[in-house]
Amino acid sequence: MSEKEGKVIPETNGMKRPRFDPVKLGLPEEFTLTDYTRLKGCSCKVPQPELLALLQSVSTTPGRRDVGMDCSIVKLQHKDETGKPLYMVSTTDFFFPSVEDPYLQGQIGAANVLSDLYSTGIDRCDTVLMLLAASTDMDKTEREVCTQEMMKGFVDHVRLAGSDVTGGQTVMNPWPLIGGIATSVVAESQMIRPTGLQPGDILVLTKPLGCQIAVNLKQWLRRPSPIFEEQIQGKMDSEEIEELYNAAADGMKRLNRMAAALMHSHGAHGATDVTGFGILGHAKNLGSAQKADVCLVLDSLPMYRGAVKASKLMGDKYRLFEGYAAETSGGLLVAFGTREEAEGYIRELYETDGEPAWVVGRVVRREGSAPYALLQKDYKIIEVGAKVNDKII
């Protein structure tokens, strides 16, 4: 993306890339990056219940309800030219490979770390540090090629987002790793804190669900697993799986930057991005951070069509239908005060970014010991197909 007259405008240069060909990079024909990890993308996160238990033993800032949300928001000693306080908003994220192509993996890594900033309505990142691990399980040539390609993809995507990589850390590790630290210094008016949801708010999601299923199926297509052979093979063909994987890969590398920029003009009350805890896990986290006592009720969920089919065949092994399937570089879950504001946001996002978004629920008053978020029992699944000639089929 680039800036024009102070506005974020869409920019697709660099987003399209030929299909991954390892031989052209000097790698073996059968090379695939996901062979070098057992935990893919954001599914490598410590499970949410375990993480919450660990955090209880660590002293955090007393009285802060947003501790544990996507970003750290710290008031600085410095002020802007009008004397108003400035805030440092920072986040870090990294993960193991989820796709076969190291360049694409770098793009996804950049989109994922920037997404945490975007969830606070910040669409301009001041600086990014890159965190990288080169794989000791690869031979020297494979390691050099893959590390360089991941770095290129990461740096190119950060530049596409209007920022620069200004440093970082690179280490050796059996599994490759990519991620970073994103930081912006902003005034209060330039961000939307994640604590302002109110009963009656309407919830919008900006990307479909089902990435984890997509990347697993893609790997199983090349290296069949017992579950693939027993439950998928013969019931989903390679074309269906490739279509699902390509749609998910495009979604994972897509920046949430425009979605962040439009939050301000449509009166968003707060947001989170959907990653390793699944949509319901992140909705619960968002609900628990609110000043008001609220519950987020999800009544419709957009899912990639192929992921829906595969999940049914596997008995919902990855808990997609429960709302707990891990997503990598997923969409923003945004709350708006009225349905008109939510629909206006969806419409403008499609007009400017060319991508759909969906109303997925509402915010209600939380009663007693009710959960901070829940899936409505009869919730609707919206099946999302591949994108052909810029139309969703």
UniProtKB/Swiss-Prot annotation:
State the active site.
Answer: 42
Q: Where are the transmembrane segments?
A: none
Following inactivation of the gene, the phenotype reported is: RNAi-mediated knock down in procyclic and blood stream forms (strain 29-13) impairs growth following prolonged exposure to oxidative stress.
Q: What GO cellular component entries does it have?
A: cytoplasm; nucleoplasm
Cofactors, names only: Mg(2+)
Task: Give me the residues that bind ATP, please.
Answer: 45, 68-70, 93, 116, 167-170
Recorded catalytic reaction(s): these are: hydrogenselenide + ATP + H2O = selenophosphate + AMP + phosphate + 2 H(+)
User: What InterPro entries does its record include?
Assistant: PurM-like_C_dom, PurM-like_C_sf, PurM-like_N, PurM-like_N_sf, SPS/SelD
The protein's superkingdom reads: Eukaryota
Record keywords: ATP-binding, Kinase, Magnesium, Metal-binding, Nucleotide-binding, Selenium, Transferase
> Where along this sequence does the record place binding of Mg(2+)?
70, 116, 273
Instruction: Give the cofactor binding note.
Output: Binds 1 Mg(2+) ion per monomer.
An example Gene Ontology molecular-function term: ATP binding
Q: Where is this site: Important for catalytic activity?
A: 45
This enzyme's EC code(s): 2.7.9.3
Please list where the region (Disordered) is annotated: 1-21
Family listed: Belongs to the selenophosphate synthase 1 family. Class I subfamily.
Its biological function? Synthesizes selenophosphate from selenide and ATP.
Its quaternary organisation is: Homodimer.
Q: What is this protein called?
A: Selenide, water dikinase
Native source species: Trypanosoma brucei brucei (strain 927/4 GUTat10.1)
